[in-house]
């Protein structure tokens, strides 16, 4: 599987951890892991996926944090942690994701800590999707990231918030 560029999995309700070998797929560009309701953590080696452009971790409700090694994902453009109910803070060095353009964090109900200081280094970040409570966390950051748009997600399932 060394040339695999995209992995998309959904509804692995009983999987508590991902295989460590997943982090050795060098050419991987997209990783979609959704509805893994018992997944508690990502492998620390996640940062070795240096070609990853899209990381979608939707509805991994037991996922409590993102590994600090995520700072190695220098090509990451889209990070979607929507409905990861247990994430309480973003990684300290999230600002090293120098190509991050879109961050979707709608439904991260435990995320109430101030954003890491390094967040102001996300110069390419253009679009954040979150609820009203999390949007307040971005207010101090927006004075540094002047092109950033924080979209407050609606309670209904309209897709109008998606970037065109």
Where are these regions (language model features)?
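Predominantly recognizes leucine-rich repeat
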Residues: 1-113, 117-164
